[in-house]
Design a protein with these regions (language model features):
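Short, flexible, mixed-charge glycine/proline-rich loop motifs
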Residues: 1-9, 74-82
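Amphipathic, positively biased hydrophobic alpha-helical segments used for protein targeting
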Residues: 11-13, 114
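Short cysteine-rich clusters marking metal-coordination/redox-active sites
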Residues: 13-16, 87-90
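Short recognition patches in nucleic-acid-associated and regulatory proteins
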Residues: 20-73, 98-101
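A short, surface-exposed interaction/processing loop segment used at functional sites
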Residues: 100-123
Length: 123
């Protein structure tokens, strides 16, 4: 199982229409390694919050990318990921596409039902 973190985003649920806080599972800036006493895994972040990761001058910083988007360019500071999520109200399985600038989830690109997983994004 790969390491992951959580990004919290406010969005209407595409299944029930209720405004909800969606908890999106991301592999960006996630790793079972870390500093003594804590790992880059299973942490919650708000949209726009800097995710804990290696310092920029550390050679491991560049491994922040999840590489789960076929449109991404290696070496770019931008990555996108379709993340698993679910509605806390109706429990519908969802996806949320997030755009990252390095180790920051910048914005929501799309929200939909998991059955309609977007083309070009790995599950």
């Amino acid at each position: 199982m790969a390491a992951f973190n959580w990004i919290l985003v406010a969005s209407p649920c595409p299944a029930c229409g209720i405004d909800a806080q969606l908890r999106c599972q991301t592999h960006v800036a996630s790793d079972y390694t870390g500093y003594p006493g804590w790992r880059f895994h299973d942490r919650e972040y708000q949209l726009g919050e800097v995710m804990a990761w290696w310092p920029r001058e550390d050679k491991r910083f560049a491994s922040w990318r999840a590489d789960r988007w076929r449109g991404g360019e290696r070496g770019s500071e931008i990555d996108e990921e379709a993340c698993y999520a679910s509605c806390p109200k109706c429990e519908a399985p969802l996806f949320v596409v997030l755009r990252f600038r390095e180790n920051v989830a910048e914005r929501v690109v799309a929200v939909g039902n998991e059955a309609d997983w977007p083309a070009g994004y790995l599950k």
